[in-house]
From Swiss-Prot:
This is Argininosuccinate lyase. The keyword Electron transport does not apply. It is found in: Cytoplasm. One of its GO terms (biological process) is L-arginine biosynthetic process. Signal peptide: none annotated. The gene is argH. Keywords: Amino-acid biosynthesis, Arginine biosynthesis, Cytoplasm, Lyase.
Amino acid sequence: MAKVWSKRFDNALDPFIEKFNASIGFDKKLILEDLDCSIAHAKMLGKTKVLSPSETLQIINGLESIKVEYLEGKFSPSLPSEDIHYCIEHKLISLIGETGKKLHTGRSRNDQVGTDIRLWLRKEIDNIEILIADLQKSFLNLAKANIYTLIPGYTHMQRAQPLSLAHHLLAYIEMLQRDRERFKEVRGRVNISPLGAAALAGTKIKIDRHFTAAELGFEKIYKNSIDAVSDRDFCIEFVSTSALLMSHLSKISEEIILWVTDEFSFAKLTDKCATGSSLMPQKKNPDVPELIRGKTGRVYGHLQALLTMVKGVPLSYNKDFQEDKEPIFDTAETISSCITAMTILLNEGIEFNIQNLSDSVENDFSNATDLADYLVSKDVPFRTAYQVVGEIVKYCLKRKMLFKNLKIDEFKKFHPEFDEDVFVDLKPFNVVKSRNSEGGTGFAQVEKEVKNWQKKLSI
């Protein structure tokens, strides 16, 4: 197959360089977007009378036929086509003849590929937003069922304060909501049409860029043709936002991996979301969260690749930009599969060990802050109360005791304001219940937030 640009050259391209230069192996993923882009372009050329009505209809029908052939599995883009754009153009010419050669009037592959990527990415972002919302709903269902389930809260991976398990789960819903908002913001910058910018300087052909933008569902057009063909910010923003999402999924995964260990034993995995060992018959491995955690680095790598790709590249379009597609293709596939896997894991792959969770908050000093708050309620300055409780913790550790094992007389040795009601305040359930500041882990606050999220997520 002759290259579209071959008449400029005396000799054929080296076979290895031909393969090295080609992008058809991966940009064929854009075939439907490229067909839609070309149909919109043909309609516009007809509207502006660059094409006659019969030529316009012939080209559109030809492109629609190619789409049908592809969807029916009768047409598969491949070498020797250099890229998806020329592949479709060549196919169109073979179907309708010389008229097909008029399709590329007033555009370049530079603005064409930018349009295709944006159409593809816009659709992916819409799907990802739905997947994240489904994951939020899974977290919310677990939270709703565990408002009164207690779990140790950690700072520095040390026991800190007892929490409602629902409060802990709601924290992930908040993170995921920020991810959804970021994707929506990225979509807004994706949804700008570069079509009609041509190679870099626009075109003298009579075109209507606003018409093609409207046909393809874009909100507006690029106002600078150079920027239109050279902008890859939106690719970087998409992968950057995806990297942040993956950091959240990795955080969730790490906690699940810890929770299902014998050392924590806060939860267990069901058979639907765990695997075994080829050697050790007792093993039940958390492969799903481990894979999600591992795939996070993959997305981080794509972000670094894109940032490096655009670094120091002069205006306007450069062949470097061929390297933008595989990172965004793989990122979209990776995050979609990870979100789906995590949703399945939460829905049917994890069971909390309620008794172990309850026991865990009964046998530590995570109620130490509440002991200090008790003294504060007796008009003792907080810093004084803090120091008193520090002394009590040290006293208990030396004797291998907990607060609940002390007698009231022992408490009074440290401060006279202690009374019998201190034991009520120290019960983990009451500790959690009392933290009713807005956004806190108190049951009333958690119930309120569960209801708020039910409204937001329409469940």
